[in-house]
UniProtKB/Swiss-Prot annotation:
Family label: Belongs to the PINc/VapC protein family.
UniProt-recorded Gene Ontology molecular function terms: magnesium ion binding; RNA nuclease activity
Protein known as: Ribonuclease VapC6
Cofactor(s) listed: Mg(2+)
Top EC group: hydrolase
Domain PINc span(s) in chain numbering: 26-120
EC number: 3.1.-.-
Keywords assigned by UniProt, alphabetized: Hydrolase, Magnesium, Metal-binding, Nuclease, Toxin-antitoxin system
Sequence positions that bind Mg(2+): 86
Tagged with keyword Hydrolase: yes
Biological function: Toxic component of a type II toxin-antitoxin (TA) system. An RNase. The cognate antitoxin is VapB6.
Length: 127
């Protein structure tokens, strides 16, 4: 559900997106677009998501899931490790049986501590 930054990986995601195998949810798009340096770049990013990645709706029960997830993370000593956006993305993926594509170690922590979270790093941790 996250976009990649390296050319080879980005091309692979474009091919999978063309097959409708990669989607994007509103929280992920909002987080990605906040890296825009100006209005034109913001518009380009927004168009890219609309053109390439199908929408994956956030579940209506997301806040109950987040409350439960934060409780599990607190028991593991990691309550502050995931942002609200990270948790929204995790629930959206978990509710639909999807894998979170990421470039962020926080999602690996989520996979260790939260049920139904599956993740895949899209770039090497060494890059």
């Amino acid at each position: 559900m996250a976009a990649a930054t390296t050319t080879g990986t980005h091309r692979g995601l474009e091919l999978r997106a063309a097959q409708r195998a990669v989607g994007s949810c509103e929280p992920q798009r909002a987080e990605f677009c906040r890296s825009a340096r100006n209005a034109d770049e913001f518009d380009q990013m927004s168009r890219m998501f609309g053109d390439v990645y199908p929408d994956v709706p956030v579940p209506k029960s997301v806040w109950r899931w987040i409350d439960s997830a934060q409780h599990r993370l607190a028991r593991a000593g990691a309550v502050g490790a995931l942002s609200v956006v990270d948790l929204l993305i995790c629930d959206t993926a978990a509710a639909r049986g999807l894998v979170v594509l990421h470039d962020d170690a926080d999602y690996e922590l989520a996979e260790r501590h939260l049920p139904d979270i599956r993740v895949r790093r899209v770039v090497s941790a060494d890059d």
